[in-house]
């Protein structure tokens, strides 16, 4: 019973320290912009897994990769802190 409680407690804390969002490009001309895609879930899934996310997919309406269960330290795009200057 104690082991089951410990597993559930651990799963809870892991879930608390994860987030979902659009990963951003960290260097170059497009720094601060979302990672773009055009209906290519495999590309986005690979990008998200490299960032230690659980899965990723191409969000068609935004033409950008969306990642689920990213660690908190991975920067994600936010409208409030948008620094993308790509044209």
Swiss-Prot record:
The reply to whether Metal-binding figures as a keyword in the UniProt entry is no
Intrachain S-S bonds: 33-84, 37-58, 44-65, 48-67
- Report where it is expressed, by tissue: Expressed by the venom gland.
Q: Where mainly found? A: secreted
What keywords are annotated for this sequence in UniProt?
A: Amidation, Disulfide bond, Ion channel impairing toxin, Neurotoxin, Secreted, Signal, Toxin, Voltage-gated sodium channel impairing toxin
Could you tell me one molecular function GO term of this UniProt entry? sodium channel inhibitor activity
Q: Give the superkingdom in one word.
A: Eukaryota
Q: Which residues form the signal peptide?
A: 1-18
Location in or out of the cell: Secreted
Membrane-traversing stretches: none
Query: Which InterPro entries does the entry mention?
Result: LCN-type_CS_alpha_beta_dom, Scorpion_toxin-like, Scorpion_toxin-like_sf, Scorpion_toxinL, Scorpion_toxinL/defensin
Its GO CC terms are: extracellular region
Domain free text: Has the structural arrangement of an alpha-helix connected to antiparallel beta-sheets by disulfide bonds (CS-alpha/beta).
What is this protein's function per UniProt? Binds voltage-independently at site-4 of sodium channels (Nav) and shift the voltage of activation toward more negative potentials thereby affecting sodium channel activation and promoting spontaneous and repetitive firing.
Protein name per the record: Neurotoxin LmNaTx64.1
Provenance organism? Lychas mucronatus
């Amino acid at each position: 019973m104690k082991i089951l409680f410990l597993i559930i407690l651990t799963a809870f804390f892991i879930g608390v320290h994860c987030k979902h969002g659009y990963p951003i490009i960290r260097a170059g001309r497009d720094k601060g912009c979302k990672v773009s895609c055009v209906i290519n879930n495999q590309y986005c899934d690979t990008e998200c897994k490299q960032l230690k996310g659980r899965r990723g997919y191409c969000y068609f309406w935004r033409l950008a990769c969306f990642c689920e269960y990213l660690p908190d330290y991975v920067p994600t795009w936010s409208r409030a802190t948008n620094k993308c200057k790509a044209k």
